[in-house]
Amino acid sequence: PDLSFLGDLQGLLISVAPTRRNEAYGDVFERGMRSLAAALRRRISTQPLHITYISSVSVYGDQRGEEVNESAALDTRSPVNSMLATAEELMLDIDRPDTSICVLRLGGIYGPGRDMVGMIREAAGQQVPKNGNAINAWSSLVDIARGVQFACDQRLSGVYNLVDDMQLSRRELSTLICDQEGLPPVLWNHTSSPTDRGMNARVSNQKIKDAGFQLVSPSMLQPVTA
């Protein structure tokens, strides 16, 4: 494909999520990311370029609920996590003095069109086949959009967790929501299934805050109008 247009860009947002677990898809995804990284490395341009690559905090895997930051080791046992980690590395390895690369790791997404609180209410009293003791990280759509703009404006380089402040297990979050509404609790499993990617960590967002970013949505329990 003709990727000569890359030389005209000043900013580039890459958001491609590997969603299939089979090996053939993994090869296609990795080959595509390698081709894009190679094209970015050899682009002909006289202007600087900032790249933002959207990844996921799921790459931390099961950390037994411990706090993790951007320097933590990644859990690549899952095929999807392995693809994400490889893509991050390919982007960060683009070695050009006129190119800055920022990886934003997102949590589960909520906001306009993704009413997670409403989904939890609908699950009240039902059995959900996921580990209720696992701690997830969350990202507001509003803060994702703001974070991408912030990364570009500030020419951020390296890896940043773009997640909100909430660090509750699935069970704690659903119980809090259901109790407020007088609903029966969601019935979760107590362990992860073999097919679960096993995210269980308190993901720190301190690095991006230290860079000057301010959340408008500290948690999904505090509604924000986009």
Annotate each PLM feature.
Residues 144-199:
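Mid/C-terminal beta-alpha module of Rossmann-like enzyme folds, strongest
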Residues 7-52:
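NAD(P)-cofactor binding segment of oxidoreductase domains
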Residues 15, 51-57, 104-106:
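SDR active-site strand-loop-helix element
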Residues 196-226:
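C-terminal amphipathic/interface module of NAD(P)-dependent oxidoreductases
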Residues 64-103:
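Catalytic helix-loop patch of NAD(P)-dependent Rossmann-fold dehydrogenases
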Residues 37-79:
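Conserved Rossmann-fold NAD(P)-dependent oxidoreductase catalytic core, especially the SDR/UDP-sugar
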Residues 120-130, 183-188:
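A short C-terminal helix-loop "cap" of Rossmann-like NAD(P)-dependent dehydrogenase/epimerase domains
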Residues 109-119, 129-150:
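Substrate-positioning beta->alpha
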